[in-house]
Amino acid sequence: MKLNEITLSQYITYAGNLFKCIFKRTAILQKKVEGFSGISTIAKQKIIESMQEVLEDSQTLELETEMHYEEGFPHTTYWEELKIYIDKYKTQPWNLYADMKSRRINGLYSSFLYYYAKGLVDDITLLEGWASEVRI
């Protein structure tokens, strides 16, 4: 094993914790969006719904990562779902940011969405690296 490689057991722990962090951070940011004033109701609702998707998908994958399977882990379906999650959330937050920026929302809110997207994509990239190391 190389110095930076992780084991499957470590992946399960790390990925489970990362999904929890993504969930908590997104939930906190979603609450902040609810308090935004000065943007349209439609724009605010789009941001909230986008974040809700992240919450639901992250929670599902957290549970699937930490679940104990009779036939063992990892299973093909998990890796397929993880790939879909990674592909979706490496682009979705940037698309949301670009959409809101094109609506010319307040610079403060635009910066907020930029850092939300950057944080989420950085986490997803880290998760993708871990998964590629342990994928059997």
Language-model segment annotations:
Residues 2-136:
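Long, low-complexity or tandemly repetitive, helically biased scaffold regions used
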